[in-house]
Amino acid sequence: MESQQKCIVIFALLCCFAVLVALIFSAVDVWGEDEDGITEENCSKNCRAVLVENIPEDISLLDNGTAHVPLSVGLYSLLDRAIRVVEIVSPLWLLNSSDYESSFQPAARQGRALLSRLQGLKAKGIQLKISSGMIDSTELKMLARHNAEVHYVNMTALTKGHLLSSFWVVDRRHFYIGSASMDWRSLATRKELGVLVYNCSCLALDLHRVFSLYYGLQYRDFIPSFWSKRLFALFNKDAPLDFTINNTKAQAYISSSPDVFIPKHRSNDLEAISWVIQEARHFIYISIIDYLPLLSSNAHKYWSRIDGLIREALILRKVRVRLLISCWEKTEPLTFNFIWSLRSLCMEQANCSMEAKFFNPRVQRDGSLQGINHNRFMVTDRAIYLGNLDWVGNEFLFNAGAGLVISQPEGIEDRNSTVVEQLRAAFDRDWFSRHTRSLQANKIPICIKHQNNRPVPGKASHIDNGPMPIRTGQHDTAPAPMRNSHKDDGHTLVKTRYHDERPTKIDHQGFANGVVPIIDSYRERGQVKISNLDTSQLQNKGSYQDNPMDPPSQSAESSGSREMSNRSL
């Protein structure tokens, strides 16, 4: 009897040991973390930041003193500074425009030039590391032949989402983060914005840890039970980095999504966005592609995480809010209902100001859209948030993205030198440009008319050019079961219907006949059901008419008892 008990105890111990070993080996391991000697104790805190933008040649913006560097020039400057390693995460790799369509714009050559520079890193003895979703890309294969280390992350199996992060880390000293993908259109036809940060190894090392997390997930089909300590965040919203940027004091940290990709101490993107909104005292300016506070599945469910904070800022703190949203084929019609709902809060309310505009792309001869405002940032009187995800519920639950928060105190003498003021100037320039339109009652925005009145090119989310043939993929994988479950504040789990930015496979016979299939992203048109939502708040004022929008010089505002106010630009 006693020997039997001993056997049971030994067997139990062996089982525990086996489980422990399995947990250890399931953790993501990061190699080479301290090769260059940079640690959180000796990292550099005296940094310089520069805004980088791609503004298409045919978009004319007033010069309001906004200082920015062309995106291509900024990326080249990072490559010029590289000594040991360049790490890149991008949702797309479509730099060689000639593979898809004849390049009708000289600016499209920038993509091929950047690809050539990346290929040339090998000759300089510089290592190129890339983390990518499971995409089929000629560019990635070409770079792999030039000794680039390409690791693929199976997001379908891990979260049923997509890898949408877009950033560079160079030698763990310099980095870029912003809206641009490694896509020739990000260097030519799209309006993009990001920030380059130089000689800032503290933040660069922290962003490198986000890269290392993706890098270590290559081909895994489950979320590790725990993360390596070397992936823990160095800074977060409760313990930000105190540093100097452009000779002014500031605080900063890196955020990321989704929650299942959050190691210890890392703030997620929703926490970062919430913090920036809650800390605002005078204004909140938001420039985003899509704004849709819904969780989408067969039925839509109201998602209040961001929308509720904006309402609180308007009503309780009397903070002025401006919302600049891209107007394009994939703009969800319910977006306008939510914006009207926000504006209605300021009816008959003193010192309440909510304004909304749409950045209008241009319709090309072939019917495609060009010049979509691809920006994804928020600026307040105290801080900025610059991220990779749109403000749609499913984005934060399933897709991988990263963000940068920088806060700077008020009362700085040379306010124009601060990143906060530079980003505000960029927002103001866009807001008052002739390319923006205000939402008016009883008038349908041109982007939705464009969508409803002609066949939509078969394309995935956030593509502003015409249809392009996809190259057959070899990494297509079916969803695999996850080890971890997802929760969102009591909401039921829903599967994302968001599509990434890769060109969608097109039936060329149908395209030749002028009919191209419509691919929706996070909606089922005509069958929208909303639960947990006061539908009376979403009732649009009047019915949409087939009328053009207001002229560029008109700005809509809800402020006190005013329904509309005119502003001459």
Question: Where are each of the predicted segments found?
Answer:
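Charged, low-complexity intrinsically disordered terminal segments
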Residues: M1-T477, P481-L569
